[in-house]
């Protein structure tokens, strides 16, 4: 049995794997993870300021519907 060195080829090299599909999948996962993170940040911001926004809107509506017409003499 002859060795690889006898044929002048040396140690066989490992072929480079096809990384195109793997890279595309990794980028897709990374993009989706960023979208989910942004959405969670937005949701938490809205939820934390929801009561304050509701109260401000309610007071503004009272001002526009009740107080301003009374001041105008309607």
UniProtKB/Swiss-Prot annotation:
Membrane topology: Single-pass membrane protein
TM regions (residue ranges): 51-71
Cellular compartments annotated: Cell membrane
Pathway entry: One-carbon metabolism; methanogenesis from CO(2); methyl-coenzyme M from 5,10-methylene-5,6,7,8-tetrahydromethanopterin: step 2/2
Superkingdom of the source species: Archaea
GO BP: methanogenesis, from carbon dioxide; methylation; one-carbon metabolic process
GO CC, any one term: plasma membrane
EC number: 7.2.1.4
Keyword Transferase: yes
GO molecular function: tetrahydromethanopterin S-methyltransferase activity
Pfam families reported for this sequence: MtrF (PF09472)
Reactions it catalyzes: 5-methyl-5,6,7,8-tetrahydromethanopterin + coenzyme M + 2 Na(+)(in) = 5,6,7,8-tetrahydromethanopterin + methyl-coenzyme M + 2 Na(+)(out)
Major site of localization recorded for this protein: membrane
Keywords (A to Z) from UniProt: Cell membrane, Membrane, Methanogenesis, Methyltransferase, One-carbon metabolism, Transferase, Translocase, Transmembrane, Transmembrane helix
Enzyme class: translocase
Keyword Signal: no
Family (UniProt): Belongs to the MtrF family.
Quaternary organization: The complex is composed of 8 subunits; MtrA, MtrB, MtrC, MtrD, MtrE, MtrF, MtrG and MtrH.
Function recorded in the entry: Part of a complex that catalyzes the formation of methyl-coenzyme M and tetrahydromethanopterin from coenzyme M and methyl-tetrahydromethanopterin. This is an energy-conserving, sodium-ion translocating step.
Name of this protein: Tetrahydromethanopterin S-methyltransferase subunit F
Phylogenetic classification of the source organism: Archaea, Methanobacteriati, Methanobacteriota, Stenosarchaea group, Methanomicrobia
């Amino acid at each position: 049995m002859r060795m690889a060195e006898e044929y002048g080829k040396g140690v066989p090299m490992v072929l480079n794997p096809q990384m195109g599909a793997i890279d595309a999948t990794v980028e897709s996962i990374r993009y989706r993870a960023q979208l989910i993170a942004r959405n969670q940040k937005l949701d938490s911001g809205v939820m934390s300021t929801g009561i304050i926004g509701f109260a401000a809107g309610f007071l503004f509506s009272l001002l526009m519907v009740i107080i301003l017409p009374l001041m105008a003499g309607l």
